[in-house]
């Protein structure tokens, strides 16, 4: 497992930190956790291709955690992405999906699935389990855990 912190700042940018975004490279996949507005630039600095991202997990809908998502999706489309992308988030993700599509310039030529989730196991493969848990914040907020399954 390789974890890259793209941003760890709060809602206000600073000279040295960017809005939240974390990349997990594991199990032959690249997963993004939160997508602050500087995510694309930070991916370039980290030499991580956004085209390799297979899943995006959003913790909550404050702007510093999600405002990079519309631009990232548009850039993936401009770059000719074809493979599906799955986006997970707490209740309210369908409103985010509708907002992205209503921006006027958004038409995507690759499949995007928006999945609203709550606490519990949200994804299980032969190699790993991803769980979410609601945590204290002033809005619905999910924390995520990734558990690697034991190999026989």
List the predicted regions and their residue ranges:
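Binuclear metal-dependent hydrolase catalytic cores
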Residues: 1-152
């Amino acid at each position: 497992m390789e974890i890259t912190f793209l941003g760890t700042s709060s809602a206000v940018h600073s000279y040295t930190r960017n809005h939240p975004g974390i990349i997990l490279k594991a199990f032959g996949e690249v997963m993004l956790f939160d997508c602050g507005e500087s995510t694309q630039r930070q991916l370039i600095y980290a030499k991580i291709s956004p085209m390799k991202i297979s899943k995006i997990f959003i913790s909550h809908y404050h702007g510093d955690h999600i405002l990079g998502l519309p631009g990232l999706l548009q850039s993936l489309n401009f770059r000719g992405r074809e493979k599906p992308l799955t986006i997970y988030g707490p209740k309210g993700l369908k409103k985010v999906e509708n907002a992205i599509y209503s921006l006027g310039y958004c038409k995507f030529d690759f499949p995007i699935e928006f999945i609203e989730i709550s606490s519990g196991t949200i994804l299980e493969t032969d190699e790993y389990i991803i769980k979410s848990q609601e945590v204290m914040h002033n809005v619905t907020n999910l924390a995520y855990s990734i558990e690697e399954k034991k190999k026989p």
